[in-house]
Amino acid sequence: LTLLFSTSCYSSITTSTFIEQTKLYENPYWSKLLHYTNGESEIDSDNFFISKDGKTDLKKELFETINSLENGQNNVLCRFPLRVKWLKENIPSLEKDIVNYSCAELDEFLTLVDAKYVTMVFPTAHINSPASMYGHTFLRVSSNEETPLISNAVNFAAKTDDTNGLIFAYKGLFGEYEGRYSILPYYEKIKEYNNLEQRDIWEYDLDLTQDEIDRLVLHAFELKDSYSDYFFFKENCSYNILWLLEVARYDLDLVSHFTFKTVPLDSIKILKPYNLIKDSRFRYSNMRKMKNILEE
């Protein structure tokens, strides 16, 4: 992906004036890009922000981002490609005074993912796992509808090595785990849920345009090295997957519907009023397949 940075001192004055006049830092989409709710970001790692006050100050974060771009800090440019893309689209002077710059890591990532289709995946509840007693949701991004097993999965989960269910439940309730996004082969998730844990899986194909899919993938790249505190009942896997969809489509309002708890099944139901679901499929677990055979 070819990105751009500014080289004009004059553009800095023009850009600052434009931002103040338009109050671009108050744009709802800017707050979505930074995962803001109730005046602060839900992302807890410092590396997600350019400004030291970025977690609580949208204006400072926007101006610091612009300053970094104008100073040619290519690590910022390549680290946050969707932010840069959106800023270019909304600040005319920034688009005018920029030159090409290539980001090898981002190019490799986009080639690997090659997303053309997005599916919400819902493995049903796993009674023996405290983390999955309500089920789980993640996204599958595919380049070909006919070969889903060689697609990639975009997942959000607590980073933990604890095997004691009580310890996991306690830490999960009080946000003592880091929740992280990850991208991994879809067949690994199928193996984990469908075969090893014997969980049935629902797949919901989402009706997203290519531009919306591109935004989702770019934002997943921006999030891959950051974390947010994981809370079992609310800011869990399903809640954080909804952030990706909100960023993908400008008019979506999803996470605000979940104030106290986020049940995975409810996070799927909330997609229906927006006509996001265009098709669904059911993938039987090996145990259910065997049971059906025995009952025939």
Where does each model-flagged region fall?
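Activation targets extended, charge/polar-rich intrinsically disordered C-terminal tails
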Residues: 9-101, 204, 221-296
